[in-house]
Each structure stands twice: as structure tokens, then as C-alpha cells.
């Protein structure tokens, strides 16, 4: 396979804080990834000097995390690794304060979650206990539309590669993920040691009893032995090129001699020079003169591309971060007067009732929204109503809520445009709830500004 032919996929790694996520992820990146030998040697030397030699894979990841948290934008290639079939990007590993927010507003939707579970006595039980973080992360992944899952049973060396322990854990984990919403038949369960490397890239000789994993896919049965093969067996995502254009703006630049250049990531549809786009909720329509990525002109931009595009006769004052660009002739975006959403309260110290007005982070928009009405309390797993018009909801509850943005904002139903249909509720400097938008009441805005070039282009 040529280098260019590989599909890009995104994975998110979840699991309890001591499950060995960093070591396992570090190992994959280390062995098949974008870290050059020089950097590895430097890290190894530092780790040895600090007496952390045994910790080298996690150390690699810790170095990357520390640099990222200090705001040094390290080369993102460091979070990538290759399998025979895919280029894999690790979006984020939890434990990071903003993990939940990143997962929701994150630049990318994960195609698959890798759940790492520690096999050690007591460790496994702690990881999936009632209040376990693991449960929260798995539920979040499922709620946010990450429908594929791989389970890696880590630290098998601490159980002397016990087959009974492995089978006991699988039985429990199957029940656990079923409660979350996943179908265990479609999940690969792999016994590994992220630290020693067993069953990571090569089949281990330590578990002769292990015959390999198998899972059902749309195409039939898939089998394999290693974690790498399980990642390779992820079903390739369908990128939404056929949907109408949605491009949330990250920034708008004014570039001398060129003019106004909005920048953002195409979430759905395609963007081509000559197209007439509408920005919502600003309600400005204009023609796209050129599209570029990494300083190269593109004939068209597709979902996943971070592009800059030059628009005619629009000032930097007209459009801003959080606006969404779409095709003026194909379901153009519009501001939302109100919307209903399924909201899950994660950690709020008190009760949440009508009138609560926290800030919502949805795609690139960051806007206060009022919980206007709690319509019904629902069972998180089934989505069925358990109480009509509750007075309050608290941590752990899920409800259907009618929300009203404090100023115009552009959102969409999750089923139509997933990245514009999920949000994080931020309050007290943390994510207190997450939501998935069910329906949007689009404000019928008065006719907006249409530039001359757009009017001309429309006549063509």
C-alpha cells in the first residue's frame, strides 16, 4: 500500500487512571509511530537518569503531555502511529483535565474507543466500580457516537497470565459494556502487557491458552491476536462528503493584499472556489475566491481538512469565531432561536433547574445558554422517560431540556451534523454536563447581507 493510500482514523483511549493507558499508548506510538529515534534516545537517557528506566513508554507520553500542557504545541505526529491499514491519531487520553471537553468540541470525532482495563486483583474491580471513571468515559464515548470499541486487558503479567482471571474479567466487562450500550459481539478482547509488549504488535508466547480474539463486523467475522490487529480491524469510517457543507470558524484573519480569510475545519460537505457560502448566525452571504491548506491552493476541501478560504467584500467585523459557513444553495446554516437536547449531568455540586445559564461549548462557539425548561428526566441507557417535567436534575441524571442561547448561535441536530450537535456545559471551570442536540428551532432571520460578488455568482 502506498503511503498516501492509507485511511486516517482517530482513536480515543479510555480507562481507569492506573490501568496503564499511558504505557500502552506510549508503546504503540514508540514502536509504530512518529517519534524519531533521536527523541526516543533523549527520553530514555533522561528517564534512566531519573531512575525511571522501567517507565519508559509512559515517560514518552508524560513528556509529550507535559509539553502540551505547558502550551508548547509539540509536533502532532508524535500522537500518531501506523498499522498496516491505517494512519492512527490518538485524539486524547483521559486524565487530562479537559478530556471531556476535548472529546466533545474536539477537532475530531473518534472512530473507535480503546478501553484499557487492568487485570490485577482489586485493580479491575476499582476500574469498573459504580462510581468508576471508566464507566463515565465509556458512557460518554457511546453517547457521543463512538460506536466501535476495543477492550485491552492490560497488566496480564501481574496475574501470571492466568486464563481464569482473563475469562472472569471478560465476563464482567461484557456485562459492563452492554449496560453502556455496546454489543459485546462486535468487540475484540485482547490480553496484553503494555509494558512488556505481549500481544501488542506480536503474539505473546506467555499465554499458549489464548487462541485470539474475534468479533462480528458488517463484512462478517474478523479475527486476530494482537492489539495492533484489533486496531487494523476497525471498520473504516464514512467521511460525510455527501452532506451539505458545515464549517465552524476557528478564526478570521485580515491579510493585506488578500482580504478576509476565515479559517476552520470542514466537518461535513465540500468547499470549492466559486461556491457561494452563507455564514450563520451572522447571516452574511458571499463568494469563495480560493481555498487553501498548509499554504497550498486546493481544488476542493473535504471533511477533516483545516482550511483557510478567501471571501470577497466581507469585513472582519461581519463574521467571527463560532460562526458556521455552509452552502447558500444546499441547506444553508441558520441561527438557533432555541433547541432541545439530551443533557447528562456529570459533576455538578448542586441541583440544576430551569433558569440555569451556564456556558456551552459547541464546535467552536462558546456561548451562555439558558436551561429554559426541563421537559423530562430519562434513563441514560434506554433513553426512555422516567419522569415528566422534573423540577431539578443532579449529577448522574439525564434529561431532555429546552435551551435558549443568550445570543445567536448556530447548532444542528446530532443526527444531521454530529460535530455541531454535541456540546459541553462549562461552569466553575469544569465540564459539568454534556449534551446531544435532538432538534433545533431555527430562527427565521431577516434577509441578511449578500455581497455583490455573491449576487453575481448566483446569477451564473
UniProtKB/Swiss-Prot annotation:
Biological role stated in the UniProt entry: This protein promotes the GTP-dependent binding of aminoacyl-tRNA to the A-site of ribosomes during protein biosynthesis.
G3: annotated span: 92-95
Gene of this entry: tef-1
Primary location class: cytoplasm
Protein keywords: Cytoplasm, Elongation factor, GTP-binding, Methylation, Nucleotide-binding, Protein biosynthesis
Residues annotated as domain tr-type G: 6-241
Homology family: Belongs to the TRAFAC class translation factor GTPase superfamily. Classic translation factor GTPase family. EF-Tu/EF-1A subfamily.
Subcellular location: Cytoplasm
Matches recorded under Pfam families: GTP-eEF1A_C, GTP_EFTU, GTP_EFTU_D2
Region (G5): 193-195
Protein name per UniProt: Elongation factor 1-alpha
Domain of life: Eukaryota
Binding-site list for GTP: 15-22, 92-96, 154-157
Residues annotated with N6,N6,N6-trimethyllysine modification: 80
HAMAP family to which the protein is assigned, alphabetical: EF_Tu_A (MF_00118_A)
PTM annotation (N6,N6-dimethyllysine): residues: 3, 317
GO biological process, one term: translational elongation
Cited Gene3D superfamilies: P-loop containing nucleotide triphosphate hydrolases (3.40.50.300), Translation factors (2.40.30.10)
Amino acid at each position: 500500500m502506498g503511503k498516501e493510500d492509507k485511511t486516517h482514523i482517530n482513536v480515543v483511549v479510555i480507562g481507569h487512571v492506573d490501568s496503564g493507558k499511558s504505557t500502552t499508548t506510549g508503546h504503540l506510538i514508540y514502536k509504530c509511530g512518529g517519534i524519531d529515534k533521536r527523541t526516543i534516545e533523549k527520553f530514555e537517557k533522561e528517564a534512566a537518569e531519573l531512575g525511571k528506566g522501567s517507565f519508559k513508554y509512559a515517560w514518552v507520553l508524560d513528556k509529550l503531555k507535559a509539553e502540551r500542557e505547558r502550551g508548547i504545541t509539540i509536533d502532532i505526529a508524535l500522537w500518531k502511529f501506523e498499522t498496516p491499514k491505517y494512519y492512527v491519531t490518538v485524539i486524547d487520553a483521559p486524565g487530562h483535565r479537559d478530556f471531556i471537553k476535548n472529546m466533545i468540541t474536539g477537532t475530531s470525532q473518534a472512530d473507535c474507543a480503546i478501553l484499557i482495563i487492568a487485570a490485577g486483583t482489586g485493580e479491575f474491580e476499582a476500574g469498573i466500580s459504580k462510581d468508576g471513571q471508566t464507566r463515565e468515559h465509556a458512557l460518554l464515548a457511546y453517547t457521543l457516537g463512538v460506536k466501535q470499541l476495543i477492550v485491552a486487558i492490560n497488566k496480564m503479567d501481574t496475574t501470571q497470565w492466568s486464563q481464569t482471571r482473563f475469562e472472569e474479567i471478560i465476563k464482567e466487562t461484557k456485562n459492563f459494556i452492554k449496560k453502556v450500550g455496546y454489543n459485546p459481539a462486535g468487540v475484540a478482547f485482547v490480553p496484553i502487557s503494555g509494558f512488556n509488549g505481549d500481544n501488542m504488535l506480536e503474539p505473546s508466547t506467555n499465554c499458549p491458552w489464548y487462541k485470539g480474539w474475534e468479533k462480528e463486523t458488517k463484512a462478517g467475522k474478523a479475527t486476530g491476536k494482537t492489539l495492533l490487529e484489533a486496531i487494523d480491524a476497525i471498520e473504516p469510517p464514512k467521511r460525510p462528503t455527501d452532506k451539505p457543507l458545515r464549517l465552524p470558524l476557528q478564526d478570521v484573519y485580515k491579510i493585506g493584499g488578500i482580504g478576509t480569510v476565515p479559517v476552520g475545519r470542514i466537518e461535513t460537505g465540500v468547499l470549492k472556489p466559486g461556491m457561494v457560502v452563507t455564514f450563520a448566525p451572522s447571516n452574511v452571504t458571499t463568494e469563495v475566491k480560493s481555498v487553501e491548506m498548509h499554504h497550498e491552493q486546493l481544488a476542493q476541501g473535504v471533511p477533516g481538512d483545516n482550511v483557510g478560504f478567501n471571501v470577497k467584500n466581507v469585513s472582519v467585523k461581519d463574521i467571527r469565531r463560532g460562526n458556521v459557513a455552509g452552502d447558500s444553495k444546499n441547506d444553508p446554516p441558520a441561527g438557533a432561536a432555541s433547541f432541545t437536547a439530551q443533557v447528562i449531568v456529570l459533576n455538578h455540586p448542586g441541583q440544576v433547574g430551569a433558569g440555569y445559564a451556564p456556558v456551552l461549548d459547541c464546535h467552536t462557539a462558546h456561548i451562555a445558554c439558558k436551561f429554559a425548561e426541563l421537559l423530562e428526566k430519562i434513563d441514560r441507557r434506554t433513553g426512555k422517560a422516567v419522569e415528566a417535567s422534573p423540577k431539578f436534575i443532579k449529577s448522574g441524571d439525564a434529561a431532555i431540556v429546552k435551551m435558549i442561547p443568550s445570543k445567536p448561535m448556530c447548532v444542528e441536530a446530532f443526527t444531521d451534523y454530529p460535530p455541531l450537535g454535541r456540546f459541553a456545559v462549562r461552569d466553575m471551570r469544569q465540564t459539568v454536563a454534556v449534551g446531544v442536540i435532538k432538534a433545533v428551532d431555527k430562527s427565521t432571520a431577516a434577509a441578511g447581507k449578500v455581497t455583490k460578488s455573491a449576487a453575481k455568482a448566483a446569477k451564473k
